[in-house]
Amino acid sequence: MAYIEGDTGKWEYVIGLEIHAQISSKSKLFSGSSTIFAANPNSQVSYVDAAMPGMLPVLNKHCVHQAIKTGLGLKAKINKYSVFDRKNYFYADLPQGYQISQFYYPIVQNGTMEIPTSTGDLKTIRINRLHLEQDAGKSMHDQSPHYSFIDLNRAGIGLMEIVTEPDISSPEEAAEFVKKLRNLLRYIGSCDGDMEKGSMRCDANISVRRSGEPLGTRCEIKNINSIRNIIKAIEFEAKRQVDLLESGEEIIQETRLFNADSGETRTMRLKEEALDYRYFPDPDLLPLVISDELINELKANLPELPDQKIEKYTKEFSLSKYDAEVIVADESVAEYFEQAANECNPKMLTNWLTSELFGQLNKASIGINECKITPSNFAKLVKLIENDTISGKIAKTVFEIMFETGKAPDKIVEEKGLVQVSDNNVLNTVIDEVIAENPESVEGYRSGKDKLFGFFVGQVMKKTGGKANPTLVNQLLKEKLSS
């Protein structure tokens, strides 16, 4: 349990999240308009999106399927009967004068997700609901000193709003939840999770209380656009509330905006209640009825999800839970790993993947899909180390060449003459030379100066150009020096 340290004692965080995830779909929720990002302003707007009189919405079946699959991934109940409602409010970039959402009967309810805590335990976060709704357009106030401009390309794009219960007890837990949810959505293929492009946005409902006391008054922080800012926004807002309460003031229930530059939240508007939006069923849309057959079909076609992969990697490949989580955190990395793991030692592969490959990818600022080393060639490199064809040190040189050129490791080893020397007779000859050339060091070692052993190993490696099998060198040197 994390606490906020106030002047009068400790306070608890109470946090609930609302995640707006843009549905991966080529067309919008109720029209056939394209959803391509960064298109020319107002180039992807149908008469439905612009709310022209007489234009009726037509539900996108693919968006419904994406919501069902996401609900299944969240271990939630898929409601066979759900209804679209009109949420009435006025924004200039909302042409209809209302948003089509689901208030009374959402498509998904009562899910769960487990997240790791600071103690290493797993904590269950309850998902209250997932509902479908349409996005608004975008208002631009910096294009002219006299006018505001409206871009309706985003208007009508399908969103899944995923709402948690107030089960989150620290900024770090909130960040873990969003990271894990984003990864799940990417595996399912229902949202790309790109927070920079706005295809995943996070609102945080935050209150504070003394341990054991009732819930306090909450404030909602809108449109937090990165994992780092989730932590910053929650920390600032919780401290702001603690300072107010400790000075004898009350918390006003309101909606606030987080400023990433200043690291502060500011008042946006007083918090609305459901009554303010005058929800009522949309008369232009029939209730959504979902069959058991459809649910079962979508469930059968779900990909292997992150938690399932972690369990498989720890059981089948004997990886540590930590290593499994690191690999599974990126679907492309997990796919790469699985292709290579079928051809070599998975544990050794993991070590090289998470150290050498990740290091080079970060240095080059590229993703694993852009890497020139194929999974098969990576597996070949691991096998060359495993069967003592090359040493770990030589393997690093080979790996660097592979990363630059994409060449197969066996060809590089052959071209460069890098095969490890593992012949006892050859190594014994070299060791005899080293011992003969360094009588004083031999005498020193035999008189108890054990640290000199590293000197002898270094001399053997020098004479063999670094190609000597280090395990054999250690073994043979010990035998020679102790005789």
UniProtKB/Swiss-Prot annotation:
Reactions this protein catalyses: L-glutamyl-tRNA(Gln) + L-glutamine + ATP + H2O = L-glutaminyl-tRNA(Gln) + L-glutamate + ADP + phosphate + H(+); L-aspartyl-tRNA(Asn) + L-glutamine + ATP + H2O = L-asparaginyl-tRNA(Asn) + L-glutamate + ADP + phosphate + 2 H(+)
InterPro entries: Asn/Gln-tRNA_amidoTrfase_suB/E (IPR017959), Asn/Gln-tRNA_Trfase_suB/E_cat (IPR006075), Asn/Gln_amidotransferase (IPR018027), Asn/Gln_tRNA_amidoTrase-B-like (IPR003789), GatB (IPR004413), GatB_C_1 (IPR042114), GatB_Yqey_C_2 (IPR023168), Gln-tRNA_amidoTrfase_suB_CS (IPR017958)
Biological process terms in GO annotation: glutaminyl-tRNAGln biosynthesis via transamidation; translation
SMART domains membership: GatB_Yqey
Ligase in keyword set: yes
Enzyme Commission number, as recorded: 6.3.5.-
Keyword ATP-binding carried by entry: yes
Superkingdom of origin organism: Bacteria
Keyword annotations from UniProtKB, A to Z: ATP-binding, Ligase, Nucleotide-binding, Protein biosynthesis
Molecular-function annotations in GO: asparaginyl-tRNA synthase (glutamine-hydrolyzing) activity; ATP binding; glutaminyl-tRNA synthase (glutamine-hydrolyzing) activity
Alphabetized NCBIfam families for the sequence: gatB, PRK05477.1-2, PRK05477.1-4, PRK05477.1-5
Its biological purpose: Allows the formation of correctly charged Asn-tRNA(Asn) or Gln-tRNA(Gln) through the transamidation of misacylated Asp-tRNA(Asn) or Glu-tRNA(Gln) in organisms which lack either or both of asparaginyl-tRNA or glutaminyl-tRNA synthetases. The reaction takes place in the presence of glutamine and ATP through an activated phospho-Asp-tRNA(Asn) or phospho-Glu-tRNA(Gln).
Record note on quaternary structure: Heterotrimer of A, B and C subunits.
Family: Belongs to the GatB/GatE family. GatB subfamily.
UniProt protein name: Aspartyl/glutamyl-tRNA(Asn/Gln) amidotransferase subunit B
Source species: Rickettsia peacockii (strain Rustic)
Gene from which this protein is expressed: gatB
